[in-house]
């Protein structure tokens, strides 16, 4: 029996050795796995952080592009409105010129007539209303008579001898000029001193 007992003990020891060896191997592998996994996780986190940063930059760039696009469209819309107003005013200017000529050529005899007074006042009122409308839209007359010639605002159509006037002084305005904001819609046509 002692042999049998001895053999059993050897088998038990052998199983314990196998179990111990098996138990040691996973412990070593377990210790190695977390280290490798931690390095992989750090690399993964770094890669994700870089990707997030890249996406953030892309979003910021797209937002800036959109803001620039929006501002450009606002400028274009404002410019389009200004150009439209400018074109309409250009078309109205001959009408205003005609009213001014009509008012300046009313004979004195007609002005003295009671029957003509409502007609004259009506023409003056129409001219006044036109000018008021243009002023509200930002249109202004260019001052000319008595000023020095400025090619940015005036167009000299002729020169005359004007005693007492300095050369290039505007002595007469032939046609009124107008501005819309900073832009000249029509240059004032003027006569200047030699």
Curated annotation (Swiss-Prot):
GO biological process: protein folding
GO cellular component: cytoplasm
GO molecular-function term, one example from the UniProt record: protein-folding chaperone binding
Disulfide bond entries: none
Keywords: Chaperone, Cytoplasm, Stress response
Superkingdom field: Bacteria
Primary location recorded for the protein, binned into one broad class: cytoplasm
Low complexity: bias regions: 20-38
Pfam families (alphabetical): GrpE
Annotated family: Belongs to the GrpE family.
Stated name of the protein: Protein GrpE
Organism in which the protein naturally occurs: Chlorobaculum tepidum (strain ATCC 49652 / DSM 12025 / NBRC 103806 / TLS)
């Amino acid at each position: 029996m002692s042999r049998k007992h001895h053999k059993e003990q050897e088998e038990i020891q052998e199983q314990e050795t196998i179990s111990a060896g098996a138990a040691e191997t996973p412990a070593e592998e377990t210790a190695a796995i977390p280290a490798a996994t931690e390095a992989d996780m750090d690399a993964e986190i770094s890669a994700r952080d870089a990707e997030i940063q890249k996406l953030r930059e892309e979003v910021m760039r797209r937002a800036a592009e959109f803001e620039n696009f929006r501002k450009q469209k606002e400028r274009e819309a404002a410019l389009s409105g200004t150009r439209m107003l400018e074109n309409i005013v250009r078309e109205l200017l001959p009408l205003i010129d005609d009213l001014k000529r009509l008012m300046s050529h009313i004979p004195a005899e007609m002005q003295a007539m009671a029957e003509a007074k409502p007609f004259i006042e009506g023409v003056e009122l129409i001219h006044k209303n036109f000018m008021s409308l243009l002023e509200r839209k930002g249109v202004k007359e260019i001052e000319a008579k008595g000023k020095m010639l400025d090619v940015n605002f005036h167009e000299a159509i002729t020169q005359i001898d004007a005693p007492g006037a300095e050369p290039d002084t505007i002595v007469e305005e032939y046609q009124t000029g107008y501005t819309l904001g900073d832009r000249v819609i029509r240059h004032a046509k003027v006569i200047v001193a030699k």
